[in-house]
Amino acid sequence: TSGDKVLAYTTTYKNNPFLDDGYIKGLQEMLIRNPRRAKVAVLGEWGISEGLVFENFDVVDFDINKKIQQIGKTVHGMDFGFTHDPTTLPSAVYDEKNHELWIYGELYKTGLLSEQIISEVKKRNLLAATIHADAASPMTIAELKHKGMRRIKAAKKGPDSVELGITFMQSLKIHIHPSCTHTIEEFNTYVFDQDKMGKWLNKPVDANNHIIDAIRYSLEEYYGEAPAEFKTYNISL
């Protein structure tokens, strides 16, 4: 669409060469299962998916190596899964000065044993990187550390850790590289919960967040105990 001073160009999954057949099939199924959300998430129409936790993100094709050289600070997180839930490892450049997060890499696979996780980490040249991982899996963390991931560490978990992490992420401008298809999907489907009357609750649904959880872990050193007046999610509907 265009006007006197505005030019808007809409792209959809049909324009993204990075998407695999399985991901495309999922988007096409969304058109049938949830056409209201698919209008935004799949067809690119104006608006937002209702109840989204994060509205502060975009998908942009940036030069990864150049961005790393410019800013210099990369962050990595890991969430563990196996049969139904995936093991994830997102990588991002964090621009602390400008409050921007540039997500450029992702691992998203089910059925990974520790040896296979090590192999995936090696492929990404992250064996020596600091990786903040899910504290609920101390045995897996110990195995990975023993097998060469010397700088993997358990993320801190407390009564407010999820809330603090999400609030901090909401304060950033988040850019996602189009090659990170699972990350894009999660940011487009991670929503707040509702009660039986349809009222929005002050907590997200615990789903579609395997990469998002790992991103929270990766950023934990940048947020601490928040003042009481800030201990709330930012809900904008």
How should each PLM-predicted stretch be described?
Residues 11, 42, 89, 131, ...:
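A residue-level signal for conserved active-site and pocket-lining positions in enzyme catalytic cores
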Residues 69-94:
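Gly/Thr-rich phosphate-binding beta-strand-loop-beta motif of the actin/hexokinase/Hsp70
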Residues 16-78:
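ATPase catalytic-site recognition across NTP-hydrolyzing enzymes
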